[in-house]
């Protein structure tokens, strides 16, 4: 019986095979299309798997594992506990960075958390970045709440490998109750009176709209603002009113990675308000808002902002007698480099070897070098001229380029530190290509990079390629 069933099944298979190959044999074009579809589907599946593995292979333990429950949150509103939590957060943010602390922070959990935070900085939307790194939720007299960043939070949000204080993460804040008088009394607590952050109002705190505006100013070259101002300066007097400046701001923001990724989220309260905050409009256009803003005044605002952010970065390293170590300065230069960890460690070791008992660098020396970096494109051109002329790119050449291009004097000690980092073969000459590429990234603080993993662009390229290939197969020449 089993043999008869097997024979009948084989007979039916033979009949089906003859029918398929005889009556429904696909054409050559259909075979090609089927092959293209199969290859395209395989490529999409493989690419998706690789990107997913890359994004989540090093996923850290949940940073919100110690998130307080509802009762804890209610108790945190008590002023005594708020002040104690605030003190702990301030201590964590202001702790010095000696060598023993670096060893303490190099634990497995801390490394994974910092990697996770770096991915937030690189790939998340502005809304999530702001909610993660902001540390204050202010409750005003009517009972309305708003989330704010301190200037230190702002610098931390754009600086890789700067760990968020413990128990402060996504939607985890220090709650403060302020009335108008208390804000005025504690204004100096978050920003010095001479700081540009003091102009933001709200005791130097940074709202979400301010955060987008400040990152736009930091990530946009000076030349772009000059061109945008000239576009909207219809009468050619070099001035724009408030309405025209809002148009300039909107256009510039749409060209930045932050602006392109932003979507208003009413559920979290992080919506981009039209115009500037009241303190900035008064700063730019006067109390009656009828003044005019010149490109010179705006570029001065940009320069002050860059100066204050650099000053905060400098102070985070806990300078001793107004000086930071050579290794800390090297860390500032390489913070946004994207250099592989092994090479980065080797460069830091080389720096430590050269300056075991170094005298350190003052803020003025650091600021002069970063003024030199603001003209990095012109510096690149000048160094290329030296290279094509056959001249060696030594320390004297760098100082000459700084005087010619940026009108600043670089000290011999600063040049020694830079050459210790970028003199790969130890012959006293600069590796100018790597130096220029890393310094361009440092100047823009990584804010010019697209805030995505490239998956969308990959899928668009694959779809376009599949369409063109299928068309070529369907209509062969």
UniProtKB/Swiss-Prot annotation:
GO molecular function: calcium channel inhibitor activity; calcium ion binding; calcium ion sensor activity; identical protein binding; protein heterodimerization activity
A Pfam family hit: EF-hand_8
The organelle targeting sequence, given as a residue range: 1-33
Sites of Phosphoserine modification: 124
Effect recorded for residue 124 to A: Abolished phosphorylation by AKT1; leading to increased stability
Modified residues (Asymmetric dimethylarginine): 457
Signal peptide segment: none
Consequence recorded when altering residue 233 to A: Acts as a dominant negative mutant that reduces the mitochondrial Ca(2+) peaks. Does not affect ability to regulate cristae organization
InterPro entries the record matches: EF-hand-dom_pair, EF_Hand_1_Ca_BS, EF_hand_dom, MICU1/2/3
Biological process, per Gene Ontology: calcium import into the mitochondrion; calcium ion import; cellular response to calcium ion; cellular response to calcium ion starvation; mitochondrial calcium ion homeostasis; mitochondrial calcium ion transmembrane transport; positive regulation of cristae formation; positive regulation of mitochondrial calcium ion concentration
Span list, region Disordered: 57-107
Binding-site list for Ca(2+) 1: 233, 235, 237, 239, 244
SUPFAM superfamilies, per the entry: EF-hand
Subcellular location: Mitochondrion intermembrane space; Mitochondrion inner membrane
Self-association and partners: Heterodimer; disulfide-linked; heterodimerizes with MICU2 or MICU3. Homodimer; disulfide-linked. Component of the uniplex complex, composed of MCU, EMRE/SMDT1, MICU1 and MICU2 (or MICU3) in a 4:4:1:1 stoichiometry. The composition of calcium sensors within the uniplex complex can differ depending on tissues: a MICU1 homodimer can be present instead of the MICU1-MICU2 heterodimer in skeletal-muscle and kidney. MICU1 is recruited to the uniplex complex by EMRE/SMDT1, and it associates with MCU at low calcium levels, occluding the pore of the MCU channel. Associates with the MICOS complex.
Family listed: Belongs to the MICU1 family. MICU1 subfamily.
Protein name: Calcium uptake protein 1, mitochondrial
Organism: Mus musculus
